[in-house]
């Protein structure tokens, strides 16, 4: 059974989003997603300064099984990427909620309200 932290919001495409105190949004992939992917071997990170709309492809996670696009759960400008993943992509398997992929300055913070809460995500993945 997947771990689903109550304080996070989730996209149906299995990204999580956390609103930070400074108004930024931290993004990663869910425990369910990393389990489905298997051992992560490479993460293609977005460029800082790039602007995405909600649902835009914002990077790629490659595992021994597949390559999977990572989508921006909300629109905004990338203000940071987790460079640690370039050398240690397996961190997404080890700590899916501690290992973020990128941070956004959201263009419309209300988009977070359109994402699933923990219970909604749990229902989506059938757990």
UniProtKB/Swiss-Prot annotation:
Its cofactor is (R)-lipoate. SUPFAM superfamilies: Single hybrid motif. One of its GO terms (biological process) is glycine decarboxylation via glycine cleavage system. The modification N6-lipoyllysine is found at residue 65. InterPro entries: 2-oxoA_DH_lipoyl-BS (IPR003016), Biotin_lipoyl (IPR000089), GCV_H (IPR002930), GCV_H/Fam206 (IPR033753), GCV_H_sub (IPR017453), Single_hybrid_motif (IPR011053). It comes from the Bacteria. Binds 1 lipoyl cofactor covalently. The keyword Metal-binding does not apply. GO terms for cellular component: cytosol; glycine cleavage complex. Keywords: Lipoyl. The keyword Signal does not apply. Residues 24-105 form the Lipoyl-binding domain. The glycine cleavage system catalyzes the degradation of glycine. The H protein shuttles the methylamine group of glycine from the P protein to the T protein. HAMAP family: GcvH. Belongs to the GcvH family. PANTHER family: GLYCINE CLEAVAGE SYSTEM H PROTEIN, GLYCINE CLEAVAGE SYSTEM H PROTEIN-RELATED. The glycine cleavage system is composed of four proteins: P, T, L and H. This is Glycine cleavage system H protein 2. It comes from Pseudomonas putida (strain ATCC 47054 / DSM 6125 / CFBP 8728 / NCIMB 11950 / KT2440).
């Amino acid at each position: 059974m997947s771990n689903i932290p109550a304080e996070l919001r989730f996209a149906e495409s299995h990204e999580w989003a956390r609103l930070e105190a400074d108004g930024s949004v931290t993004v990663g992939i869910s425990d369910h997603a990393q389990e489905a992917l298997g051992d992560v071997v490479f993460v293609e990170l977005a460029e800082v300064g790039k602007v995405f709309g909600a649902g835009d492809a914002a990077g790629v996670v490659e595992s021994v099984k597949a390559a999977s696009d990572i989508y921006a759960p909300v629109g905004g400008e990338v203000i940071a990427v987790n460079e640690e993943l370039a050398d240690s992509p397996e961190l997404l398997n080890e700590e899916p909620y501690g290992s973020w992929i990128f941070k956004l300055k959201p263009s419309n913070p209300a988009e977070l309200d359109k994402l699933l809460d923990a219970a909604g995500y749990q229902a989506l993945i059938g757990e």
